[in-house]
């Protein structure tokens, strides 16, 4: 949820140890206070582009009206971040947003602030119990991998696991039939990503992940401050947060079609045409044959 807040915050305060807070209970491990709000920002508009390794790209727009003569101030941030991932198959797509509205009224004695923020994201997960590709397993004898010290240990290098390569035709088929992207999660995932992405184009490759992680838990708040007199004030805050997140994939029953006998029918999940012989750690042709 806090991705992008550094671009809109006017100050970030870090307190170590025991700290006081207006919410629920004191913080024993420390407190991070992000100071933001439309009223404190100067009038401005900014566009920022960030580039990094492995095709990292982040685009950020921010806008602030400043405090207007009528006591109104508005601030907003929208950002998009994509990354192919350091490890194979660990692509990432993410958005972040922040909107704030401020109003001063009652001869300056009352202020009202409304804030909404969130950061929907999805990324391909890595299965840490595999380090070999399909081609590796085909080349091994049973004695090779059963005696290996690296067997069933996480890969120390960039070879990922839990993904397989599709042909462009298969990729298009899955997405055209709304199978590569599963919906009914929440509005942000449906609108921004078209649902949960099980298929993904990364560079020139078309991938399918056994696990896709997704998360979105927006936070909204309403703050009212009343300056009673020079010595006293009253602050009232209403806030809430509701979201959805987790990990899912084509091997979960929630995202597979049921066969005629009541069992999961993975064959219906994929294009019945020939599967790809491309690299990856899952032999999808054999998965289909076994199911």
Where are these regions (language model features)?
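Extracytoplasmic loops and strand-loop junctions of Gram-negative outer membrane beta-barrel proteins
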Residues: 14-16, 43-46, 81-84, 199-208, ...
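Flexible glycine-/small-residue-rich
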Residues: 16, 36-38
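Transmembrane beta-barrel wall of Gram-negative outer-membrane proteins
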Residues: 44, 51-82, 87-181, 187, ...
């Amino acid at each position: 949820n806090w991705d992008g807040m550094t671009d809109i915050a006017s100050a970030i305060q870090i307190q170590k140890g025991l700290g006081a807070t207006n919410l629920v209970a004191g913080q024993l491990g420390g407190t991070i206070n992000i100071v933001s709000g439309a009223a404190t920002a100067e009038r401005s508009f900014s566009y920022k582009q960030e580039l990094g390794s492995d095709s990292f790209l982040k685009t950020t727009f921010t806008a602030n009206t400043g405090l207007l003569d009528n006591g109104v101030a508005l601030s907003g941030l929208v950002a998009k971040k994509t990354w192919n991932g350091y490890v194979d198959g660990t692509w990432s797509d993410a958005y972040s947003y922040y909107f704030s509205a401020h109003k001063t009224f009652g001869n300056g004695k009352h202020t009202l602030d409304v804030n909404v923020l969130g950061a929907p994201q999805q990324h391909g997960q890595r299965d840490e119990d595999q380090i070999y590709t399909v081609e590796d397993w085909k080349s091994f004898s049973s004695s090779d991998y059963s005696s290996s010290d690296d067997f069933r240990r996480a890969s120390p290098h960039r070879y990922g696991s839990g993904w397989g390569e599709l042909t462009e035709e298969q990729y298009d088929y899955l997405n055209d039939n709304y199978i590569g992207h599963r919906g009914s999660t929440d509005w942000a995932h449906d609108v921004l990503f078209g649902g949960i992405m099980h298929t993904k184009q990364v560079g020139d490759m078309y991938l399918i992940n056994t696990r896709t992680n997704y998360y979105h838990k927006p936070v909204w708040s309403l703050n009212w401050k009343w300056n009673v007199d020079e010595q006293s004030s009253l602050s009232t805050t209403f806030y809430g947060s509701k979201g959805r997140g987790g990990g899912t994939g084509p091997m979960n029953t929630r995202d597979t079609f049921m066969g005629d006998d009541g069992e999961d029918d993975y064959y219906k999940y994929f294009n019945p045409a020939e599967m790809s012989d491309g690299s990856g750690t899952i032999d999808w042709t054999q998965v289909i044959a076994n199911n």
